[in-house]
Amino acid sequence: MKKTFETRKLYFGFPVFFLGYKDDVHGYNITTSSSAYSLGSMMVIGMRTKGNAVTEISKHGHFTVNIPREHLLEEVEIAGFNSRKDKFALTGLTYTVGETVDAPLVNECPISIECEVVELVECGKLTNIIGKVTRRVVEEDLLDEHGDFKGSEFSPISYIGDGSGRYYRYYNDHAIKMGSLIKKKKDLEK
């Protein structure tokens, strides 16, 4: 039986990423987030309106999404808990500037996505940054011989929890290709 559950927030398993942006004070910077989704060539990020990232991204019009693996968890926390500081200096992470945007790609992350701002939508104390994906880069070990993404082999950090506690979770090796269960069912019905 289900029960009404009162909480200020609920995170039901979102990938953790470094949001990269040009920063007038530090040159280039990052912050940690887990509020994003992507559809086709659109990327939407949710952030606090008064945060440094929203201020700088609204000025410069570019950002990157950099997806770390589990071994960067300490850097994830450092970048997420130190507001308005030089996160590259604090974490020891390195970057290169994107080819299509003036924002940093975190070298230690196996996946980076370059985005150009299309629109900023304020919703109370939060801002949705809507961007157009201009370039995606992926470590070669995550591409097969045809250049296709080996999604079943990538294990991002997942963020899950509620107002009383939040946790990092990791994927296991179990992966099922989308559509394979329907195909199997149809094959059995033949």
Task: Annotate the PLM regions.
Residues 1-190:
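Basic, polyanion-binding surface patches
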